Amino acid sequence: MSVLFEYPPLVRGILRRRYKRFFAEVELEDGQLVTAHCPNTGPMRAISTLGSPVYLSRSPDPARKLAYTWEMIDLDGTWVGVNTALPNRIVYRALVERVIAEVGTYRTIRREVPYGSENSRIDFLLTGEGEPLYLEVKSTTLNQGTLALFPDTVTTRGQKHLRELIRLCEHGTRAAMLYFINRGDCTAFSPGDSLDPLYGQLLRAGIERGLLVLPCRFEITPQSVRYLGTASILLA
């Protein structure tokens, strides 16, 4: 297992409320109630259970409106990452350290490169050895037992990204979708067909056209994030 990210000292608390998408009310261990920034604007299905232990980071910037940021939540003994700003940073570190063998060989890593016919930006473009690889990253927290699911709601943006990647594949360009499984208890991945059937259809169409799908497992702890390898893919 490769440690790809280390947290600064975090503050433990209990989740009391999530509201207006961007805010979480957390009771600290000393009983103080604080409002933390919620860096995940999605529905957070099943990962915002009130009364669950959480960890917050604290900004040293005195000018910041909210000092605390919600980083993770403990669900039945598994820490689940909440901060959606972290996955791309961690994947970049993984690419620099070349721990994801499935992406092949490359010399340069470019970020946020414009591409496609729908005004998109690819998260990572790997070039320099062999064919370039366009790599998109999606964070997933929803699960059914040990099965990770994406998406957790209808995502027109996610559908657009799949269409763009499919067009690349149809023109002979290598493209990949990396699902950042933001919890260590999942060993398999499946599209969330019941929540966004069109997304599942597009993902299957992409695979048929050569899209590389990488469901990458990560273990989240209050100390660090570790890469655990890839999960199996279930499409039935």
UniProtKB/Swiss-Prot annotation:
Record InterPro entries: SfsA, SfsA_C, SfsA_N
Gene Ontology terms, MF aspect: DNA binding
HAMAP family, alphabetized: SfsA
NCBIfam families assigned to the protein according to its UniProt record, in alphabetical order: sfsA
Family from the record: Belongs to the SfsA family.
Name of this protein: Sugar fermentation stimulation protein homolog
